């Protein structure tokens, strides 16, 4: 039987060499937009290759995204397996990647409220980047998790007090 691992701080990027990852997986020029450790112990990175094309505003400027799933041996502090999921060129600025069953949740922290309604800053995408659904989770997102049953929990950094990006009326998001 395996001995339990005693809790200690493990500097993630001393285990995962980002420069080596970029070279070996042909991700040169990408930036780490998000990293997250899931319930199953896998580490997920959202890698972004910014586009040279400017959108009508910064929220809609397209970028090419890749989800990276890394299986670690936490006790030995080594990478066991790395899997890439190219998500393609997407016309929104995403800040969070969360596994959601066999799919991914891509989430933008900021979104605007426009004449025709709010930006859809939450996208469920397949592992090959096909957009399965889009919806709005509001502006000013601090963090998020996706529960095993698919429930999305978000926290917000400004509690909606600023009214930025056209959000000048009170909105309540409820399930």
Label every model-predicted segment.
Residues 1-74:
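Sequence/structural signature of beta-propeller modules
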Residues 19-26, 78-88, 129-136:
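A short beta-strand motif characteristic of beta-propeller blades
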Residues 26-40, 86-101, 136-149, 175:
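Repeated scaffold domains used in trafficking and secretory/extracellular systems
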Residues 43, 104-105, 152-153:
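Hydrophobic beta-strand positions that form the internal "hydrophobic ladder"
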Residues 47-62, 107-117, 154-173:
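Short, conserved, GDST-rich strand-edge loop motifs in beta-rich repeat architectures
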Residues 52-111:
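Blade-loop segments of beta-propeller domains
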Residues 60-74, 118-129, 168-174:
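Beta-propeller blade signature
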Residues 100, 106-127:
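Recognizes the extracellular SEMA beta-propeller fold with strongest preference
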